UniProtKB/Swiss-Prot annotation:
Keywords: Hydrolase, Late protein, Protease, Thiol protease, Virion. InterPro entries: Papain-like_cys_pep_sf (IPR038765), Peptidase_C57 (IPR004970). The lineage of its organism: Viruses, Varidnaviria, Bamfordvirae, Nucleocytoviricota, Pokkesviricetes. It is found in: Virion. This is Core protease I7 homolog. GO terms for cellular component: virion component. Pfam families: Peptidase_C57. It comes from Amsacta moorei entomopoxvirus (AmEPV).
Amino acid sequence: MNNKIRRFPNKNLKMPESGINFMSMLFFSKIDNMVYFINPIKYNTNANIAILEKIDDDDETRGKVTFIPIKYLEILYNELVLDPNHINNINFENNIKRKFFLFWTIKKYLQDKNININTFITSKKYKGIPLVYMRKSFLKSELSKTRDFSTFATIYDDLDAQIGIPPLGFNPKPKAYPRKHDKSTWLSSGDIYNCIYPLTMINTDYDYFHLILFEKTDKNIATVASSMRCYKLEDRVKFFLMNDKKRFFMFPIIYNDHFTCCVIDKHFDKDKKAAYFFNSSGYIPELIKQNKKYMFIESDMTIKSHKHYNSTPNTNYAYLYIDVLSEYLNDIFKNVNYYFFNTFELQYDSPDCGMFNIIFLYYIVYFNIKSKFEFKKLYYSMSFIGDLLASSYRGALFISRYDINSIDEFKNTLEIFNIKNKKFMELIDMYKKNSNRIMNVCSKIKNDYDSYIDNEKNSLESNI
């Protein structure tokens, strides 16, 4: 933990992440979409609801019985069944029962023909999207363990302690940071790809590249060839720049065993391009060599150019990849005019840098973020995400081994089943408790309002 890192007031005040913080995020998301928010109640099954709500227009049956849309089941039924007119002689009470009949007829056909289900849904497409993307992907890593960020001491607590002031905040007894986590909980670039790439098939302005991996970075030879693996990246960028249907190019980055990510907007301002970087540990402008193209987003959401900071003459090793990558991107993208970096720290402890990046990229594609203000709102929305929430969303956006018996069973299951892993249940518990708190608060506000109206009415009557 570096004491030059900036943090948001909600973290310095140690507002409970699972309480006040989650409640604020839930409430703000309902007020003209002030913040971006993934509502966990929509992610309670193995269906990839983010895809289905875009392509499955049957509200009654979407995400029920099977993740395959009913209209595509009807197409398959007509293609595969010997007597497709048979269904027209059956009187179904509702579309759910109709979908149930279609599904089990097709499933029996696949079993009788000894057709592998996973191969089948990988090869078949509906509205241009493979059926395999209509279910969530399987999480090969372990679920991570972490605590609410309000339980951790902050740099300001440390400074308070130095001058004899006891810790101040909603949680007055902060705990020490725990030991390092087991690598079995680390996400892979494949996990990020499986979660984000399918969304780019719905909102097609976004192009996703699988990974830029830094094996090493030589301070004296800051060239891509000496430090970075990015197989076929240049070819992808050339195609992207020629493709008028694509505006954003995004990719995760691994450097020093830490995930960060970058999103490039080729139409940031007319013919100018911009690169948005996100780091759950934050960037420290004072430790990065001066660059006139670098812009830093502070915890109060102001954006400052690099010249406003007393920066080091040589970039610290922790951020050296930025200099390498910005030079390289500037070359292959034919000049990038602005590079934006968040200065604020979100991740205190957990092994969930991958999940922080998934949430950042998920917000962008799912909410179709494009404008400068929307990106600024995106960085603000991330301020509500800490170790606990990032860890909990792992249980919502993926299927884990705690939800189904094995990966083989997962691959060969077409039916809808409920998510039951502890991380998802933890998230739902937060949702329930904080929804009740909001309703109780709203009830108190209503009582105050009604009392005010009654008093005002009585006052008017007494003056008549």
